[in-house]
Amino acid sequence: MSRAYRQQYGCNFITAIPNNLYGENDNFDLENSHVIPALIRKVWEAKINKEPSVFCWGDGSPLREFTYSEDIAHILLFLMENYNEPNPINIGNTDEYSIKEIVEMVCDIMGYDGKLEWQTGQPSGQHRKPSSNQKLLDLGWKKEGYTSLKEGLKKTCEWFIMKYPKVRGVS
């Protein structure tokens, strides 16, 4: 669609494709949120309710790429100055983490020491969904411009704890 508008109206419309986003102000509803906000909420509520375990779907092995929401904002500003092509561009961080690694990081950040119980009867999802951000890097975006998953999770968890229970999807 952006290509058609670009051609028809002569405007610099581009298509920037992120991967899995997370960060403050996300949707933390357990029924329809994405994996990271759901895990943050599950772990926090298990901690404050002194529950001995957190139940997670699947076996934790699928690998996913995640990008902190503030990084996407910076990348979009970068693209406004550096990209004027009709073809889509992938803009997400391509570091892969297993769901198990993510849950363990969230537990560590939140100080939850209960047990993780994997519900292997539930779907784990596709094992990998890799993307390539090489075009973005070729434009001059630096890999160091991405917030590490651990740092982004820390910021998101701290925000969630500070705002709980008045966060989207909880209150």
Features from the language model and the residues they span:
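Alpha-helical structural signal
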Residues: 18, 36, 40, 73-76, ...
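C-terminal substrate-binding subdomain of Rossmann-fold SDR/epimerase-dehydratase oxidoreductases
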Residues: 45-171
